[in-house]
């Protein structure tokens, strides 16, 4: 199963919080982080199966419309990111989010019951 990366860039923090909430509620994805870009731009990043990430991004985009002044600036999905990206960009599963990955996918890291 390919683990995809999905991103939504919004204008304003409330919009990205709304997008992130909708994304993790709509599909079996894990929120791996967000990035403050500057000038009010914020990007939220999820990981999961390609079809789940697609559904997640679609839900996030739709829900940003609920935020007064919320605006989606860009979206993108990478179906199978090269492993080098995980070491350079903030898209990897961290220890802090691993518990959520387990609940979404049923995957348990080695050495954990």
Curated annotation (Swiss-Prot):
CDD domains listed in its UniProt record: BMC_CcmK (cd07057)
Matching SUPFAM superfamilies: CcmK-like (SSF143414)
GO cellular component terms given for this protein: carboxysome
Superkingdom of the organism of origin: Bacteria
Domain notes: The tight homohexamer forms a small pore which is positively charged.
PANTHER family the record matches: CARBOXYSOME SHELL PROTEIN CCMK4, PROPANEDIOL UTILIZATION PROTEIN PDUA
The protein's name in its UniProt record: Carboxysome shell protein CcmK1
Gene: ccmK1
């Amino acid at each position: 199963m390919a683990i995809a990366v999905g991103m939504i860039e919004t204008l304003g923090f409330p919009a990205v919080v709304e997008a992130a909430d909708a994304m993790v509620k709509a599909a079996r994805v894990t929120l791996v982080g967000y990035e403050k870009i500057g000038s009010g731009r914020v990007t939220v990043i999820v990981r999961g199966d390609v079809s789940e990430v697609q559904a997640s991004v679609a839900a996030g985009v739709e829900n940003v419309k609920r935020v007064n002044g919320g605006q989606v600036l860009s979206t993108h999905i990478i179906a199978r990111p090269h492993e080098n990206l995980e070491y350079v960009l903030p898209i990897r599963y961290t220890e802090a989010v691993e518990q959520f990955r387990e609940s979404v996918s049923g995957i348990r890291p080695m050495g954990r019951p």
